[in-house]
């Protein structure tokens, strides 16, 4: 009878753990629900929302806004749409030729994806393994949402949220895009919609709180723009990123990166970082104040995250001895 009792307890514990694992990896539960469930079951699952994860010192973090030079083997730039990502990628490619590291650039994770695994992630991890065999440093670049298990120092760049949203709307309708993407947009009937309609329906290029998702992750709750998603994004920014910048101060950000990651980043050009224009062939119209208000209201998490990142950049620049004129 005694053994039967322990058998039942053990089986219950195993089933609870399996349920939690299914919950996490299927993204059907939020981290808050997971925490509550863990307490109910009598044990605790640590989530990245609530605790710091111990990592190698070579990766650094932003908890102290330190300017201490880091020498990681791998840097990952999980770039955000319409935030000078083409400009930065081109610059890093030039840096790689001068500094002798491997530069690899991959594609875009779909907004609809909610799985931890992804083909882009698999390819990046394969590149990391290859670079180690070659005893070379690596910079990987991709439009990929944050993953905890990429063994690298993260960097990223944000943009003023309203300007980024408007730019993304027009970019998705630019003839400069891949033909198959434009064809899909037209087949769905989303190509000629107004920015107001695109915002309301969250069509491609108009999803809400886009930047927050890149720092939060692929999980379903990261798409919501909720307080929980914002908290996770801020946590990851603090604990996994060597530096974050904002597009409006791109030259100062590159100066910080040069001091922070000297093996990967050269000083900015003397005449400054020249923004690469990728949205061509479209006429950008002004927006009304009511439309601007709609964009702001829909992207509250992005606005708060942008201000948070701006504050971190200014503090890190100060520690680097770099003056930012506002």
Task: Label every model-predicted segment.
Residues 44-64, 109-157, 163-269:
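PAPS-dependent sulfotransferase catalytic domain
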Residues 79-92, 161-163:
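Catalytic nucleophile-elbow at a beta strand-turn-alpha helix junction centered on a G-D-S/GDSL motif
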Residues 62-64, 74-79, 241-244, 292-293:
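A detector of helix-start/N-cap boundary segments at the beginnings of structured domains
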Residues 214-223, 232, 266-326:
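PAPS-dependent sulfotransferase catalytic core
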Residues 2, 74-79, 83-85, 105-109, ...:
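N-terminal initiation segments
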Residues 1-76, 89, 93-102, 110-120, ...:
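Juxtamembrane luminal stem/stalk of type II transmembrane Golgi/ER carbohydrate-processing enzymes
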């Amino acid at each position: 009878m005694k053994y039967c009792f322990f058998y039942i307890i053990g089986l219950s514990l195993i089933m609870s753990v399996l349920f939690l694992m299914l919950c996490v990896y299927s993204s059907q539960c939020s981290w808050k629900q997971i925490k509550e469930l863990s307490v109910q079951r009598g044990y605790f699952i640590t989530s990245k929302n609530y605790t710091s994860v111990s990592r190698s010192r070579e990766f650094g973090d932003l908890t102290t806004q330190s300017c201490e030079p880091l020498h990681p083997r791998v840097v990952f730039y999980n770039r955000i749409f319409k935030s000078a990502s083409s400009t930065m990628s081109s610059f890093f490619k030039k840096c790689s030729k001068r500094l002798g590291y491997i530069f690899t650039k991959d594609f875009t994770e779909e907004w609809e994806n909610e799985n931890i695994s992804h083909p882009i992630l698999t390819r990046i991890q394969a590149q990391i393994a290859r670079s180690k065999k070659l005893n070379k440093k690596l910079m990987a670049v991709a439009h990929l949402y944050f993953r905890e298990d990429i063994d690298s120092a993260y960097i990223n760049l944000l943009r003023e949220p309203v300007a980024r949203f408007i730019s993304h709307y027009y970019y998705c309708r630019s003839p400069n895009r891949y033909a198959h993407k434009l064809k899909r947009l037209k087949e769905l009937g989303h190509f000629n919609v107004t920015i107001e309609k695109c915002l309301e329906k969250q069509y491609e290029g108009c999803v809400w709180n886009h930047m927050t998702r890149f720092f939060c992750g692929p999980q379903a709750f990261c798409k919501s723009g909720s307080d929980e998603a914002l908290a996770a994004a801020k946590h990851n920014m603090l604990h996994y990123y060597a530096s974050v910048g904002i597009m409006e101060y791109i030259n100062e950000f590159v100066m910080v990166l040069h001091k922070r990651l000297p093996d990967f980043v050269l000083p900015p050009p003397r005449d400054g970082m020249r923004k690469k224009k990728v949205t061509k062939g479209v006429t950008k119209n002004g927006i009304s104040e009511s439309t601007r208000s709609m964009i702001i209201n829909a992207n509250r998490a992005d606005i708060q995250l942008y201000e948070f990142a701006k504050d971190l950049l200014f503090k890190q620049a100060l520690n680097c001895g770099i003056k930012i004129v506002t």
